[in-house]
Structure formats: C-alpha cells, structure tokens
Amino acid sequence: MFQATSTGAQIMHAAFPRSWRRGHVLPLRSAKIFKPLACLELRGSTGIGGFHEIELKVRDYELDQFGVVNNAVYANYCQHGRHEFMDSIGINCNEVSRSGGALAIPELTIKFLAPLRSGCRFVVKTRISGISLVRIYFEQFIFKLPNQEPILEAKGTAVWLDNKYRPTRVPSHVRSYFGHFQCQHLVD
C-alpha cells in the first residue's frame, strides 16, 4: 500500500470503489435538437421585432441603498414580462399549474447596461427565440422610457415540467401558440 521514493518520502496508493468515481458527463445536446419556430429568424437578429411589450414603473421599495433598482429586482421584471407574454398568447401560467404542470427557469443570464431609479418608466420586451423538445428559449430587453435607453439584456431557458417536476415535452398546443405569435408579428 505504501511505496518509498528516492527521497525517502512515502507515497500511498488508494483505490476507491467504482461507485465513488464520477460518471462521464455528456455534453448538453439541446443545441443539436434545437429547432427554431416557424417564421422566426435566429441568425444574429438585432431588430426588435416580434416582441411582446409591457410598460412598468419603478417603485420605491425596489431600490437599494444607492437609490437605484436592486439587481435582484430585474429578474422579477423579467418574470413579469414572461408571464404577461404567455398570458397574451393564451397560456395561463396558473392554469398550467392547476393542471399539474410547471414551467421552470433553470438558466437566466442578465447583462446590466444602465440603472433605473425611483419613478422611472420602462418597457419590458419579451420574445421566444427558439424551442426544443422540452425547452423554450427567450430573450428579454428593458428600455427606459421615453427615450428607449437600453437598461438590460437577458437570455434564458424555460423547461416544461410534469406533475413530478421532471422535464417533459412542450405540449403541441403551446408550440402552436408561440408559432402563431411569431408569424403574426413578422407580418405586422
């Protein structure tokens, strides 16, 4: 078990049971099965088309000690924008919950560009950028009104869950709602 080296130090060889070894981690495959929605342009689009918009106002209790909106509050703004977007296309999140399903956000990347202060009016723009078997990919932007100053960029992933909170396929009727919204807004 111990082995001596030329310097006199001892080396201990340890054998760990196979069950302790970390399994081989496979790369994420979502990129391979990712399918854009019909009528949706995904190649580096910088245009702000096909977005659902909701206007909000900063409330005093959302501020931090420096007089600007606390970073954690922006995730709430994004969630509100996503819920309003889904409600506008006919998907009621409360109804999804009552039917035993759920929608989880395992990944949300937020890039802060400028702060919001008390009383600022702003718009949250939300769109679905793609969909896979169990994931919905979305983009969100916050712009300060009235001059449309960029405040925040966010990208995230939503996962459809069954009643046991395991990932499941996005229902076909939900896919059709997203596709209809995108096609309708590309025509406008």
UniProtKB/Swiss-Prot annotation:
Function summary: Acyl-ACP thioesterase involved in the production of fatty acids and beta-keto fatty acids. Can produce beta-keto fatty acids of medium chain (8:0 and 10:0) and small amounts of 8:0 fatty acid when expressed in a heterologous organism (E.coli). May play a role in suberin biosynthesis.
GO CC term, one of those recorded: chloroplast
Gene3D superfamilies: Hotdog Thioesterase
Recorded GO MF terms: fatty acyl-[ACP] hydrolase activity
Cross-referenced InterPro entries: 4-hydroxybenzoyl-CoA_TE (IPR050563), HotDog_dom_sf (IPR029069)
Protein name: Acyl-acyl carrier protein thioesterase ATL2, chloroplastic
A Pfam family the protein falls into: 4HBT_2
Upper lineage: Eukaryota, Viridiplantae, Streptophyta, Embryophyta, Tracheophyta
